[in-house]
A protein has these predicted regions:
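A membrane-topology feature that recognizes alpha-helical transmembrane segments
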Residues: 1-437
Length: 437
């Protein structure tokens, strides 16, 4: 940026501030504009090459910009406080939710570049930024970060959408109903839910957790599952997808990593592994919900679920690269048969361990733990079954020593398996190399 842009920003902010001090207009609109202009002026003030020095001489606009920044910050705080006082508790909670969603985005896109710029100005040390060149500016870094955050947001929100569908699957499958060919409607008043009211996470917040037609409360379970699956997709995006599957044993090193080189210039074998593991954990969520509801899982669904992971992993070796035990590798010389034998062996080990754990834990429903552990064996390998089982038992001990959790989670072994898998997965390669038999 240059002095002309600084002057333009100053004039625009003064005009905006003068118009916002009145009580006319929508309060939300005033708050959004004030906060946006505050960040804009802050980005100008923090850039030493623009505000403090212009063409080698002190910039006369420096002090007015700082005063304007303070004024905008104070005005923003007053407007937000007034908005919270005018609205009821539900509106305040809604604002809190939107803030929780927006703060990470603003911190990553705006906060980090501004902090880096301030650090460079105060310390004189250049901050290393990927792709930084001679013409690199704070605005370009914000745009670059916004593009990366958008890609991350798309993958994460895809998880929320799948989580919304999994709520339906967990309800319909034990009852033998179709999960795909049905319209969403309120279970109380039977009103059909519009598309705008059926957006995962956002609609729940916007409706204040109530049906638009009859105002009956929407169970928090829907939001929790959507956020959980979104967290699965988002976390695997960060530590598995953009790292080139660095957490997976027996994976070769990927030359170029990051969102640009993995997603935008797609490396399909890494992307396929990512979705394979995302859907594996998603189905563990389904099995956990069925277990929570004390429903019986049909045998044909369990078999179909196991085959839906066994067949792709047999055809595409990269989906499960963990080597087979030596005695299985020596049985056959055909790669496909050896791969199938490895996966089937791991699935059987998982089912057997589930039977042993079931005898110890004595859950009310064994129909979900066995297919869940079989899936874990197929996807993670038989060695990881031992590691995950140890984590499960440790989590079980923690649960039984916490009074508030003792009555519910202590008899939910499939959910404990899901938690153990989520803890184990980022450290899969490290644990495999250190503790494998």
């Amino acid at each position: 940026m240059n002095g002309h842009l600084s002057l333009t920003s100053l004039i625009a902010a003064v005009v905006l501030l003068a118009s916002l001090v009145t009580k006319h207009g929508n309060a939300w609109f005033r708050v959004i504009l004030l906060v946006a202009m505050t960040f804009n002026v802050f980005s100008v003030v923090i850039n030493p090459n623009d505000v403090w020095v212009s063409d080698g001489a002190p910039n006369p606009l420096a002090i007015p910009n700082v005063i304007l920044l303070i004024s905008l910050s104070v005005a923003s705080l007053f407007e937000i406080g007034g908005l919270l006082q005018k609205n009821d508790r539900q509106a305040s909670i809604k604002l809190l939710w939107w803030g929780l969603l927006a703060i990470p985005a603003l911190g990553y896109i705006v906060g980090i570049p501004l902090f880096n710029s301030l650090w460079e100005a105060l310390s004189g040390e250049a901050v290393d930024v990927a792709g930084k060149g001679p013409d690199w500016t704070i605005a370009k870094e914000m745009m670059f970060r916004a593009a990366k955050f958008l890609v991350f947001g798309i993958f994460t929100y895809l998880g929320a959408c799948i989580g919304s569908f999994l709520n339906v699957v967990a309800y319909c499958v034990p009852r033998g109903e179709s999960a795909g060919l049905r319209d969403s409607s309120c279970p109380k008043c039977k009103t059909k839910i519009s598309r705008m009211d059926n957006l995962p996470v956002f609609s729940y917040i916007n409706l204040s957790a109530r049906c638009r037609a009859c105002q009956v409360p929407i169970p928090a379970r829907y939001l929790i599952v959507e956020l959980l699956v979104a967290a699965i997709f988002g976390s695997l995006f960060l530590y598995e997808l953009v790292t080139g599957a660095a957490n997976i044993p027996a994976m070769g090193k990927v030359s170029y990593t990051g969102i640009l080189w993995i997603v935008l210039y797609p490396k399909w074998h890494i992307i396929s592994i990512y979705f394979f593991h995302c859907f594996f954990m998603s189905f563990l969520v389904v099995l956990s919900l069925i277990e929570w509801d004390r429903q019986k899982l049909a045998l044909r669904f369990s078999i179909g679920l196991v085959l839906s992971f066994l067949i792709p992993a047999t055809i595409f070796f990269t989906l499960q690269p963990v080597p087979a035990p030596d005695f299985l590798s020596s049985l056959t010389g055909i790669d496909g048969v050896s791969q199938f034998a490895k996966l089937a062996f791991a699935g059987v080990i998982g089912a057997a361990v589930a039977g042993l754990l079931g005898a110890v834990i004595q859950p009310p429903n064994h129909s979900t733990l066995i297919p869940a552990m079989a899936l874990a064996g197929i996807v993670l390998g038989w060695q990881s079954i031992l590691h995950v089982s140890i984590l499960m038992l440790l989590l079980l001990l923690v649960v039984r020593f916490v009074p508030r959790l003792r009555g519910s989670l202590a008899v939910q072994p499939t959910f404990l398996l899901l938690m153990a898998v989520m803890i184990h997965h980022p450290f899969w390669k490290i644990v495999f190399e250190q503790f494998s038999i």
